[in-house]
Amino acid sequence: LGDVYKRQVNSLFEVKDRDALSTAYTPGVAEPCRQIKANPDDVYKYTFKGRTVAVVTNGTAVLGLGNIGPEAGLPVMEGKCVLFKEFGGVDAFPICLNASTREEVIAAVKAIAPTFGGINLEDIRSPECFDIEAELERDLDIPVFHDDQHGTAIIVLAGVLNALKVVGKRLEDVKIVQNGPGAAGTAIIKMLQVAGAKNIVAVDEHGILYPGRPAGLADHKEWLATVTNPERLTGTLADAVRGADVFIGTSVAGALTTEMAATMAPDAIVFAMANPNPEIMPDAAKAAGVRAVSYTHLRAHETLRHLV
């Protein structure tokens, strides 16, 4: 897998002789240290802080693989760093924390924050991720962004709006089922509601979310139960998707069966985004009568699996 390795660190300063070395390191570095001490904002002038981002995880919710730990999450963080550099020109560094609690993650990020111009939180399980982002946003003086929530929600909203144009439906009129209301799913629901969606049904592994559900609800799901499901449906995912115009999955592979998809409304739309394998394959969805399908792309994943 040597050729798959995604990162290296290169110097922008050529150390060609002893004078250059003494400028890059001691004693030359003493002067910018003095300047920054006198004016802390000069750290953006004299260091790489302003163009660097920390991509931080604790490995508790990596892709659809679950709690696989910080080491196993490192390839994902490296990949995200590639995206920052290739598409944004921003230098990013993967930070994989051996920290299982929200307090440990928050303390670790606060401790390393002086080095970076921004924090990208990644693959941290819910509901801890909500509190972690909120506290870091409140206490740090640099941007904090939880990609699983907000990045995913932005892209899904754009995709749903365009898919609805294709099938000739309006966001405010359609029934949307969101399966897997974790970090990404919750943010997607919030974004869709702000955009005008009025009938969203959230479903987790225990079934449809509604107030007072016997299976119980985590704090964020308790809130979701009050702001979604206006018809107060109960039951399973199969019950939720019956007559639905849009299915949005951020759950697990195979969650949406062909039989379920066949009960959706005419010209249905499916976003099968379980990672790395989708809730339903596109051929199966199309065979069930679904009009538009967006799904997790498998080709690179399968190629890498063969390399391993």
Language-model features and meaning:
Residues 274-298:
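Rossmann-fold NAD(P)-binding glycine/threonine-rich loop
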Residues 94, 120-123, 144-147, 178, ...:
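General beta-strand structural signal in soluble alpha/beta enzymes
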Residues 71-75, 154-241:
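Glycine-rich phosphate/diphosphate-binding loop of Rossmann-like nucleotide-binding domains
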Residues 2-8, 296-303:
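Conserved small/polar residues in nucleotide/adenosyl-binding loops
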Residues 241, 256-281:
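Accessory "access/gating" subregions that flank catalytic or transport cores
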